[in-house]
């Protein structure tokens, strides 16, 4: 009799927890869907070729985000150009070369700590060091260097964890064939962890696109088209996320702000999709 009561109580408890989890999952999906649909509904009607292909004109009272798109592309490329080699090389050293495990643990802890620091602190430090101490002033290159520091832990840790998934037998097989340490890393280990590098790169791009606070301190918020690449990097410029803040907060241009928000929302969805498909592709290729 007691066993029957316990069994009924356990089934009731299981059903209740299952229902609770379903409600939580449905609520999460509903909130995400509402946010995405609301932003798209508010922003897509205001998207136009004129908005995407012109610069803002205060005399004509028109909004254009072409300078912001160019600044965003330059910011992403400049950041990745520096942070990818640094992060991958640091991960390779910590995983394949470093013999002092205590030092590795300290560096890993420091990287995880850096990942949790608010971005506005990075912006303040970047302004003091890059803009003032190094004399870069507010510029895209100063913002990119600040984002390098912000995203370095992400690239390093994702690459490091991916390196650890490469079986030790692969390394031993390469050594047995007479390959040296660096040749083994270059031809066997790194190709085996390319999914981690790509995933870290995609995550970094997502963070760069969404960053605002740090760039307000270091890159500024100018909406200006410049002649050459060097002039663009050495001048102040607003990325799309910074432009969204400026239009919504400073100028009250909510139509332009929602249009930019819709663009960023689509980019975020595409980045998440790319990360998911990349992970599935390399997982399937490893299983072959």
Where does each model-flagged region fall?
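Transmembrane alpha-helices
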Residues: 159, 181-219
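Amphipathic cytosolic juxtamembrane alpha-helices at the membrane-cytosol interface
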Residues: 14, 86, 99-103, 167-199
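Generic hydrophobic transmembrane alpha-helix motif, especially the helices
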Residues: 112-148
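Transmembrane alpha-helical segments of polytopic membrane transport and secretion proteins
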Residues: 1-25, 275-288
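Periplasmic/extracellular loop-to-transmembrane helix junction in inner-membrane transport proteins
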Residues: 2-20, 37-79, 246-255
